[in-house]
Amino acid sequence: MRFKPVIGLEIHVQLNTKTKAFCSCPADVFELEPNNAICPVCTGQPGALPVPSKQMYEFGILLAAALNCKIHEFTRFDRKNYFYPDLPKGYQITQYFYPLATNGYLKLNGKKIRINRIHLEEDAGKLLHSSETITQAESTLVDMNRCGVPLAEIVTEPDIESPEEARKFLEKLRQILRYLGVSTGDMEKGALRCDANISVIDLENNVQSNKVEVKNMNSFKFVEKALEYEFNRIKKHLKKGENVVKETRGWDLASKKTISMRSKEEANDYRYFPEPDIPPVVIPKEEINKIIEKIPELPDEKINRFKIQYGLTDYEAGILTTSINLANYFEECVKETKNPKETSNWFLTELLKYISPEEVFENLKIKPKHFKELFDLISSGKITRNIAKEIFKEIFETGKNPEEIVKEKGIEVIGDESLIEDMLKKIMAENEDKVNAYKNGKKGLLGFFVGQIMKQTKGKADAKKANEIAKRLLGD
């Protein structure tokens, strides 16, 4: 029997605004003491009136444009009514009837994953369980700091066809968020949260299961694992001809399984109605266009430019554009070195051994000029590529000039041809049997003589010159 998963994602993106969605409390609350960034507005005290954040709208428009959405001039907030301990108002302010944007897409390996809608809303508080998992927790505390933090909710169409594709979609979305600067996209910190809806089609019998919602996936890896588990669980039911319950399930880290949480809610369960305290927000098209003009070059565009402008491969361009910081630093280095291919090689083989692509490159001790100086030393023959690799770490750690390190360590290449020739003559005099064997056809022994001189000079001899002189002395 053949089965195919059908997956749609609901993604909550915490926007990197200075203040919360509807009040002046700080939006960056991750490391604050519990319940220290709250006010009457974000905790829903009687008489407190919300005022929408302009920056929240700007960030939402940037995101919607980057995801190729139709951005609406007329938007309105609504109340989503439900009871939960981390929702002090008893409702969430969201955009249900008139969202910010609709009908977009994100390309993933040439395939369009359609975006149904993007709407703005406020976050709820956070429940702190006494154990790592809900099922094992004996008590739970409530931190209201996160109440009112602005969110953009992205709802995809069910175009995702595998758990792996779901993970890759989220990774690419996070990359775009970071390029735009609208969110950190850190799943581990709750800045990017994802719920998934999955059903499974039995292709042979043309039967599709009920949809199951999966929650509590706080890393890309867990999104993929949870969906793999759920795909296999639903498949087993279909194989047995059993009904799949329409429900919400949570990923349980301890058991590495999804567990049933509750029956799946429908929209009418939330009793949506217009938010009476906030009038409709109308943003003129001219204002929307001004905001869209601020969008930087996005990853796909940058990859194509790097391939054309710098002659890089798909792989090289893909790695070097992982983050906007890394891409910008690479281009600064290329301006100095005038050698994009060599710069790319050193980034991929050396620099990225010591840093994350998300590094704040302004803080690095190794500067673009150091790459140029290092390349000049190699091309002039003063140091070998192996020596350059040895001193790279010291340049990275100390910010010293490459030439300064070479002088301190006395590791400049020995390029004096007469000195190399004298050393080789002595080596050959001590190994006459190998000289004769070479002359009788064992040409592989050339490596022995070059190896001996490299050993005696501790790798400092110019290997190319040593090779040429050895051949001449051996009569070739």
Curated annotation (Swiss-Prot):
Signal peptide position in this chain?
none
In the UniProt record, does the keyword Nucleotide-binding occur? Answer: yes
GO MF: asparaginyl-tRNA synthase (glutamine-hydrolyzing) activity; ATP binding; glutaminyl-tRNA synthase (glutamine-hydrolyzing) activity
Task: Report the InterPro entries cross-referenced here.
Answer: Asn/Gln-tRNA_amidoTrfase_suB/E, Asn/Gln-tRNA_Trfase_suB/E_cat, Asn/Gln_amidotransferase, Asn/Gln_tRNA_amidoTrase-B-like, GatB, GatB_C_1, GatB_Yqey_C_2, Gln-tRNA_amidoTrfase_suB_CS
**Protein keywords:** ATP-binding, Ligase, Nucleotide-binding, Protein biosynthesis
- EC numbers: 6.3.5.-
Instruction: State the top-level EC class.
Output: ligase
The highest taxon in the source lineage is Bacteria
Q: Which GO biological process categories is it annotated with?
A: glutaminyl-tRNAGln biosynthesis via transamidation; translation
Q: Which reaction does it catalyse?
A: L-glutamyl-tRNA(Gln) + L-glutamine + ATP + H2O = L-glutaminyl-tRNA(Gln) + L-glutamate + ADP + phosphate + H(+); L-aspartyl-tRNA(Asn) + L-glutamine + ATP + H2O = L-asparaginyl-tRNA(Asn) + L-glutamate + ADP + phosphate + 2 H(+)
Assembly behavior: Heterotrimer of A, B and C subunits.
Q: What this chain does, per the record?
A: Allows the formation of correctly charged Asn-tRNA(Asn) or Gln-tRNA(Gln) through the transamidation of misacylated Asp-tRNA(Asn) or Glu-tRNA(Gln) in organisms which lack either or both of asparaginyl-tRNA or glutaminyl-tRNA synthetases. The reaction takes place in the presence of glutamine and ATP through an activated phospho-Asp-tRNA(Asn) or phospho-Glu-tRNA(Gln).
Protein family according to the UniProt entry: Belongs to the GatB/GatE family. GatB subfamily.
Protein's recorded name: Aspartyl/glutamyl-tRNA(Asn/Gln) amidotransferase subunit B
Which organism is this protein's natural source?
A: Thermosipho melanesiensis (strain DSM 12029 / CIP 104789 / BI429)
What gene does the UniProt entry assign to this protein? gatB
